[in-house]
Swiss-Prot record:
The protein's role, per its UniProt record: Oxidizes long-chain alcohols and, in the presence of glutathione, is able to oxidize formaldehyde. Also acts as a S-nitroso-glutathione reductase by catalyzing the NADH-dependent reduction of S-nitrosoglutathione, thereby regulating protein S-nitrosylation.
PROSITE patterns: ADH_ZINC
Gene expressing this chain: flhA
Cofactor note: Binds 2 Zn(2+) ions per subunit.
Subunit (UniProt): Homotetramer.
Binding site for NAD(+): 41, 195-200, 219, 293-295, 318-320
Natural source organism: Paracoccus denitrificans
Protein name: S-(hydroxymethyl)glutathione dehydrogenase
């Protein structure tokens, strides 16, 4: 069949909206009509050419929601008509990683997904002249129709709006999950969030959901403060307005009963390795945990004095918020529908597919939290 898609023909160039060929689902695969997709910084990272694993031509997009229209042989967990969220981190429930119970990083299709291909080593997309087009993160939601492995779709309730729950496909789950699944923040905790963009806002509301007592936001842009407060931030620090952000946080978290000070948990949402060091060193001696969410540039390295770790601090990383996609994503949709979490204020712009490049422009200008393309 033919479908409209925004194709990344080469690095550093705007996406081109065109008709492409899409082959139907093979065994263990499903075809999904994408109804809405977010535009994420990861898409921009690849399109810019900075992604060492970036492939072209490809159809980007990994933050979508839609309806199953066709299933291949052997598919049992979804059927046509089901509403789903594509998963760039699948959940096969059979590989060593899934069965370990210790990680959400399923390895079932990792090798082919990283090559922009389906599990059988081929692509379902091609140009009208037959030139193959690579898949992206196993999702390719910048196409009106896409084909995914069955293990890479989460079945969700049918009364949830596509234009909001698409954000659960990446940003919402990444931020909230880092709090709930990775850090396991407890009631009454003191926490710091570095970087108050889309991911940071979701970390904030994850902390609010978990019952954190003091929620400190750190950002160089004072304009981020009102929205951050809306999502649960209790204190704001602009590093430009203090001599030493680590000492500022330590002082802010001291109490009459604890003159050591330091956050119980910190979260880096910046991808800046210098900020990652501050995020670790502002945590409490003996038990502080710092969670790295932000993706650093290729080849970047983190550093701190080993003494920081020997004295009880822990550095952790997280991907997709530690969420097991098919199991956890439907629950996060329920949280949204039940009013436990918010998404609507973060969807600042809605666009047509023809205007998709405007979404990247808004991102570059810092004018959007999340732009969503509606099909």
């Amino acid at each position: 069949m033919r479908t409209r898609a925004a194709v990344a023909l080469e690095a550093g160039k705007p996406l081109e909206v065109m008709e492409v060929n899409l082959e139907g689902p093979k065994a263990g695969e499903v075809m999904v009509e994408i109804k809405a997709t977010g535009i994420c910084h990861t898409d921009e990272f690849t399109l810019s050419g900075a992604d060492p694993e970036g492939l072209f031509p490809s159809i980007l997009g990994h933050e979508g929601a839609g309806v199953v229209v066709e299933v291949g042989p052997g598919v049992t967990s979804v059927k046509p008509g089901n509403h789903v969220i594509p998963l760039y981190t699948p959940e096969c429930r059979q590989c060593a990683s899934c069965l370990s119970g210790k990680t959400n990083l399923c390895t079932a299709i990792r090798a082919t997904q990283g090559q922009g291909l389906m599990p059988d080593g081929t692509s379902r997309f091609s140009m009208l002249d037959g030139t193959p087009i690579f898949h992206y993160m196993g999702c390719s939601t910048f196409s009106n129709y896409t084909v995914l492995p069955e293990i890479a779709v989460a079945k969700v309730r049918e009364d949830a709006p596509f234009d909001k729950i698409c954000y659960i496909g990446c940003g919402v789950t990444t931020g909230i999950g880092a709090v709930i699944n990775t850090a396991k923040v407890e009631i009454g905790a003191k926490a710091v969030v570095f970087g108050l963009g889309g991911i940071g806002l979701n970390v904030l509301q994850g902390l609010r959901l978990a019952g954190a007592d003091m929620i400190i936001g750190v950002d160089l842009n004072d304009d981020k403060k009102p929205m951050a407060e809306h999502f649960g931030m209790t204190h704001f620090i602009n590093p430009k307005n203090c001599e030493n952000v680590v000492q500022e946080i330590v002082n802010l978290t001291k109490t009459p009963f604890d003159q050591i000070g330091g956050a119980d948990y910190s979260f880096d949402c910046t991808g800046n390795v210098k900020v990652m060091r501050d995020a670790l060193e502002c945590t409490h001696r003996g038990w502080g945990q710092s969670i790295i969410i932000g993706v650093a540039p290729a080849g970047a390295e983190i550093s701190t004095r080993p003494f920081q770790l020997v004295t009880g601090r822990v550095w952790k990383g997280t991907a997709f918020g530690g969420a097991r996609g098919r199991t956890d994503v439907p629950q996060i949709v329920d949280w949204y529908m039940d009013g436990k979490i918010e998404i609507d204020p973060m969807i600042t712009h809605t666009l047509s597919l023809d205007d998709i490049n405007k979404g990247f422009d808004l991102m570059h200008a810092g004018e959007s939290i999340r732009s969503v393309v509606l099909y």
